[in-house]
Amino acid sequence: MNFKAERINIALAGGIIGIISVALVLMGNPANMGFCLACFIRDTAGGLGLHRAEAVQYIRPEIIGLILGAMGLSMARGEFSPRGGSSPVTRFFLGFFVMIGCLMFLGCPFRMVLRLAGGDLNDVVGLVGFVAGIIVGVFFLKRGYSLRRTYKQGQGEGIILPLAQIALLILVVAAPAFIFFTAEGPGAKHAAIIISLAGGLIVGALAQYTRLCMVGGFRDMILFREPKLLIGFCMIFVTALIGNLALGKFNLGFVEQPVAHNDALWNFLGMLLAGFGCCLLGGCPLRQMVMAGEGNTDSAITYLGLLVGAAFCHNFGLAASGKGPTPNGKVAVIIGLIVLFIIAAVNTFSKKESAGTERS
C-alpha cells in the first residue's frame, strides 16, 4: 500500500467510525458515548458484578464486537500472531491507572473526540491534558523507555480473550439471573444487542486494518512529524460533528453536558494520567483491544488491568460523576501519576546505569 492510499484509507475508516458512533447514540447509547472503551469496560465490569454501581451495569456488545472484529480481519489477512511476555505485570498496572484517569475525565481518548464533536468544551481541557501526558511519555521514550520485546506464543494463548468475549456475548443474550443489568442510568441506555455488536465488529475491523490509535497519532506527530494516524481521528471528529449538527444533538458549552463534569483541573489531570499511561503502554485503549484481538496477550493483560481498574473506581468511590470528582478519585489520580513517573524513571534510567556498567 502506497503512502497516499494509506492516508486515504485511514481517513475513510475514521469517517465511517464517526458515523457509526453517532448512529449508536441515535439507536440508544448515551449522548456523546456512541463508543467509549473506558465507559464500556466499566459497564461490563458492573454487568459481571465486579462493582455494584447500579447505574453502570451492562455487558457492552461493542467491546465484544471490537475484539472479535479485529481478530476476524487479522486472521483473514494472516496477521493473527499470538505473542506476549513483554512486562505483563507492568502493563496490568498501567492499564489499571489509565482507567482511573479515564474515569476521572469520564471518557477514553475515543470518547474525548466524540464529546468535542458534541460541543462539550470541557473536552478541550481534557485534550490539552491528554497531549501533555503524551509529551511526558515521549520524554521517556526518547531516553530509552521500553517494555522489552515480545515472544511468540501458542495459538491457544492468543484466542483466550476472544473466546471470553464470545462467552460474554452468550451471557448478555441469555441474561441469566447472576448477570446485572442497569434499570436506570447510563448503563440502561444502549442500542439493541445486534446493532451494538455489528457496530463493534465494523469498528474493530477498521481499526485493525488502519492501526488507528489516538496516542500513536500524537506520539508520531511529536517524534516524527507524521500526521497519518491523526487523520483518522480528525475524520471521526468531522463526521461525528456533522452528524450531531444534522440530528440536533450538538450542545456547545461547559455545563449540562451528558455524562461529564466541568472541573477543569481534574479533567486535565485525569487525561494527563491517561495520556501518560497510554504512551507508556504503546497505545490507547482502542489500540490495546485491537491488538488483543490480533493475539497479543500483553494487550489482553492490559484489558484485564482496565477491567480491574474500573471495578476499583466504583467500589472505592474513585470515579467522577456529573457532579464532579470525588476526594478519593483525586487522591487516586495523584497516586497514579506518581506511580507512572516511578515506572517510567526506573525503566528508563536503570537501563542507562546497567549499560554504563557493562561498558566499564
Protein language model annotation of sequence segments:
Residues 1-360:
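Membrane-interfacial helix-loop segments of redox and metal-homeostasis proteins
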